From Swiss-Prot:
Entry comment describing in which tissues the protein is expressed: Expressed by the venom gland.
One matching Pfam family: Toxin_cobra-type
Protein name, as recorded: Short neurotoxin D1
Species this protein is from: Micrurus pyrrhocryptus
Role of this protein: Binds to muscle nicotinic acetylcholine receptor (nAChR) and inhibit acetylcholine from binding to the receptor, thereby impairing neuromuscular transmission.
Record's GO cellular component terms: extracellular region
Major location category of this protein: secreted
Length: 60
C-alpha cells in the first residue's frame, strides 16, 4: 500500500506501508490548521481529527 506522508506545508511525498491503512489528521494551533499524513491509523488526542482509509494514496 502507498500512503502520502507529508506535513501540510510540504510537497507531496509517498511511502510504501505494510500496515494496510493510511491516515490524515488535522488540528489547529497558532499557525492555523495543520495536517499530517502517514501509515497506519494511530490514536489521536482530543481536538485532533483523523480519517483513516485503506487504498493507495487515499489520504491525499
Amino acid at each position: 500500500m502507498i500512503c502520502y506522508n507529508q506535513q501540510s506545508s510540504q510537497p507531496p511525498t509517498t511511502k510504501t506501508c505494510s500496515e494496510g491503512q493510511c491516515y490524515k489528521k488535522t488540528w489547529s494551533d497558532h499557525r492555523g490548521t495543520i495536517s499530517e499524513r502517514g501509515c497506519a491509523c494511530p490514536n489521536v488526542k482530543p481536538g485532533v481529527k483523523i480519517s483513516c482509509c485503506s487504498s493507495d494514496k487515499c489520504n491525499g
